Amino acid sequence: VLTSTLARVKGDDGGTIDTKRSQRRRALGRSRGGLTTKLHLITEARGLPMRLHVTGGNVVDCSAFEAVMAGRRLARIGPGRPRTRPDRLIADKDYSSRKIRTYLRRRGIQAVIPERRDQLANRRRKGGRGGRPYAFDAEAYKERNLVERCFGKLKQWRAIATRFDKLASRYLAGATIGCLMLWLRQLEMSDTL
């Protein structure tokens, strides 16, 4: 399950010259609300975080897709090396693009991504030349709430909900510690059962 969330940046006077390059390196993006950072997250089937990626708040979600998908590994049941391809990927409309769907199709991953309204209108406007509608499993899409609940648990930590760190690497480290805490809490709960 894949999605992203914004974190508002507080207290960033920077202390350095604020160039576009330094903003990209520090994962800062300027929008109407000021400086923001976007945290992209992939969770596994139980809603536990697997892969984090940080970008500026003004970066489009689909442009960070390949970076988010790059480093994840899924443990196998029994012996064998970890899998690099999940059975399916559930994502929101922000990740609905031809490039992402092609990426997933080539790797044999089922895409459970709703079609955006403008894509649907363009396909219908073209008629028979617009192609077939994308397959969409509405029942499987209901599992997307797992990643939203994971973000809710992560944002209980003040440093993740509101970014105070100057460097993106420190913010990512704090978010990673939050993810580790979620995994440890899950292990602790499974040991008591």
Label the model's feature ranges.
Residues 36-40:
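Short glycine-rich loop/turn motifs
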Residues 53-79:
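Active-site beta-loop-alpha junctions of metal-dependent nucleic acid enzymes
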Residues 7-8, 56-60, 72-73, 94-98, ...:
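Short, catalytically relevant binding-site loops at active-site mouths
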